[in-house]
């Protein structure tokens, strides 16, 4: 089999070898690519500064590590939502078809027995006729395959209509993902479809990378859906409803706070959303904890990429048998990975809060600083008056946005969030200098900044700060060319990173913070950004009261 050597890509070859850095290469073999999405459209690769895994798939459709058109990650979540929509309606169609078939068998059996009984009665065999009728009744009562009707009022014809709709919309989504210039048009069509699943569903997005992916997937549905994302925020006033570990991550603990006791306690299917499934261990840990507290029968795992091995898949099957549940998987690309070598990374080249990473290489330390505007913006969104405790034990009493997804939301909350995001976008658009702009989400706070960026006009890119340390190399095809590091504004004990932002690439850089933080904590981030923005840096702290600038 012919291999494609990174960065070249041949869409007809299912195996691709990525030579990431010296002494490290990864071979990716596609096993399922149902929409024929080019690998090069989904991700590039980079070396990772993490002892648990030495490389990273740098997503081009997620809006996390590198700048993207904000409509692309919104569309990615919606595309996964369509896969779920198709699956749920296919399941319903199977149930309805089986139910109809079972009813037909029962009716035929009853009719046959009645005819036999009538003939026997004419022949004077009344006793045998009674036996025949009893047998017919027994046949009519015997259940056919999959006859539990959990969706009353929905017909087989309606299911077929919904599946035809899903097929059409999936074509639109694939076009938008394959050709980013159509992402906005595709997402607008999908969002306007106002889809409804045949039964309620709860979505759970994994922090920090998949908080927006899960929210975008949930947002596709007009009614009957709920969403919550896990968090690494320590909120003293609240207790975590579920807790588990992400074993291969640089930050392993996941917490889950919900204000609505019924959000997790129902029996509806749960959709676990992550950008990438490597081993599936995090999913296993999640399901085990959920089943011990909020048991149910159906789980769906949705991801952009799925790299599980045969042994990993067997672990899912074993868990299904052990707990008496079903686990289904949905993804845009499925395959296997084979790693060769160990990177010999120089510690001095890694991004650090002491020296940024791109400073000397790009000359950003020698250019004039861009002016900084700090705004406290009244966004119209409800607040939750709880505090957070950082890794140093310090308390921030500024309230959180109630509808961010961290505390649970339902379909009925979408309209209010959309209106608030659009209102913020209009105000920020008025601050633009007119050229290219970048909107930065911060950590777990990804979806609302992404949604705001999408409504700020043409020429706006989006990405988020991240905890994930990536080794930068400025060479063609490599995933991360430049890196900057600084202590997080929310927790100075945690280092945050920014990737692939060149000096003067954007006239305006907008940083959106979910809540107020002390001004001195923002300064390390400003020391990085004011060397990158061409004209101005805008730091927007949402919910800070009447808008003002300093």
Which residue stretches match the model-derived regions?
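PRPP-associated nucleotide enzymes
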Residues: 1-550
